[in-house]
Amino acid sequence: YATPVMAADARALMDHLGIARADVMGYSMGARITAFLALNDPARVRSAILGGLGHHLVEGVGLPLGIADAMEAASLDHLQDRQQKMFRAFADANKADRAALAACIRGSRQTLSEAQVGAIRCPVLVAIGTKDDVAGDAHRLAAMFPAARALDIPNRDHNLAVGDKVYKQGVLEFLEQRP
């Protein structure tokens, strides 16, 4: 289930709902999907908000495969790696379908080239927690877009940034200011 397929699914959902154009927001894997949607269907994306994904969109392949392994582990007690434990605990707390998450992590490892990122013309917000050791650098990715800005979410890691007030306020301000 590769990222371009997930982006096509998002477009199909927009079609089904009768949404011709939208501000599209995604976090982590959702941000990767948002970027692919903005590249492949630019007329559909008014603006893009990429949370929890920085320059690893270009220079990385997504979440480490060990996180997929952690989703399939018998229990949290079987894990030693801090990052694997963090993601597994988050999935368990949210009663996520861990097998589906593992499959998505393994399947959504596609990157964009710097030229492809530069071809995304809509306004873009790249927002990452300052303690996020998964996403890559927000400022490096924002500099690759023609019209983007970076938002640092202070003292938040990959899992805590998504619900942070600074993130929410930054998104609202971005949407109010975009053309």
Task: Tell me what each language-model feature is.
Residues 22, 26-27, 31:
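Conserved alpha/beta-hydrolase "nucleophile elbow" surrounding the catalytic nucleophile
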Residues 89-113:
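Hydrophobic, aromatic-rich cap/lid helix
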Residues 133-138:
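Conserved alpha/beta-hydrolase "acid-adjacent" motif
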Residues 120, 126-128:
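Short beta-strand/loop motif that positions the catalytic acidic residue
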Residues 1-23:
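Active-site loop/oxyanion-hole signature of alpha/beta-hydrolase fold enzymes
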Residues 148, 153-179:
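Catalytic active-site module of serine/aspartate enzymes centered on a nucleophile-bearing elbow/loop
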Residues 32-40, 44-75:
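Flexible "cap/lid" loop of the alpha/beta hydrolase fold
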Residues 129-132, 155-157:
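Acidic beta-to-alpha connecting loop that harbors the catalytic carboxylate
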